[in-house]
Amino acid sequence: MTDRLTQLQICLDQMTEQFCATLNYIDKNHGFERLTVNEPQMSDKHATVVPPEEFSNTIDELSTDIILKTRQINKLIDSLPGVDVSAEEQLRKIDMLQKKLVEVEDEKIEAIKKKEKLLRHVDSLIEDFVDGIANSKKST
């Protein structure tokens, strides 16, 4: 799992991509409107003009995606240590987490030693079993 700052950076990158995709969609699919009554109707033979209702629905979806990403970013920002958390408190928390990590690492090392001991014991039992079968076949 990544840390909160990395998650925040990823979300900001995703939001930037969403903005670009939305602007690209608008640019490629918008209808043409006259600015004044006397102005001729503009058109672009390369543009794909989407029906107004479909265009509006797609814009609503894209806007909703951007809003959801904004909420996700705000939630990540809120989870970061705030201005109210002093440097000493942050250092104490880091020390506590480091001690906890050392304890967990010690437990892991003990578990690995126990596993290796059990594996040697199982290997010994298997060898004794195989030797017993081999000896019983020799005697018959």
UniProtKB/Swiss-Prot annotation:
Residues 85-125 form a coiled coil. It is found in: Nucleus. Gene3D superfamilies: Mediator complex, subunit Med21. GO terms for cellular component: core mediator complex; mediator complex; nucleus. It comes from the Eukaryota. The keyword DNA-binding does not apply. Belongs to the Mediator complex subunit 21 family. PANTHER family: MEDIATOR OF RNA POLYMERASE II TRANSCRIPTION SUBUNIT 21, RNA POLYMERASE II HOLOENZYME COMPONENT SRB7. This is Mediator of RNA polymerase II transcription subunit 21. It comes from Saccharomyces cerevisiae (strain ATCC 204508 / S288c) (Baker's yeast).
